[in-house]
C-alpha cells in the first residue's frame, strides 16, 4: 500500500489540536484497510519524525437521506499517532 493510500488526510478538530499541543499526538483519517504498523511507517517517512505509539478507531458510516432516497456514508478509520519525546510536532498549516 502506498504512503498516500494509508494516510488520507489530517483531521484538524478541536480535540485534535488540543492533543497536538499538550500530548504530542497527531490525528489522521487513514484507510480502513491500514493497520498500526503501516500507519506508523507512513507517518515516519512522510513527516520525518519518530513515532512512539499508534491508536486506531473505526467508525461506521451514517445513514443519509436525500428526499426519498437513502444510503450510507462509507465506514472510515481514525488514527491517533503519538510522537516520541523531543520530536518536533509538524504544523499542518505549514505543509
UniProtKB/Swiss-Prot annotation:
Keywords of this entry: Ribonucleoprotein, Ribosomal protein, RNA-binding, rRNA-binding
Family: Belongs to the universal ribosomal protein uL23 family.
HAMAP family linked to this entry: Ribosomal_uL23_B
Domain of life assignment: Bacteria
Protein name according to UniProt: Large ribosomal subunit protein uL23
TM helices/strands, residue ranges: none
Function: One of the early assembly proteins it binds 23S rRNA. One of the proteins that surrounds the polypeptide exit tunnel on the outside of the ribosome. Forms the main docking site for trigger factor binding to the ribosome.
Gene that this sequence comes from: rplW
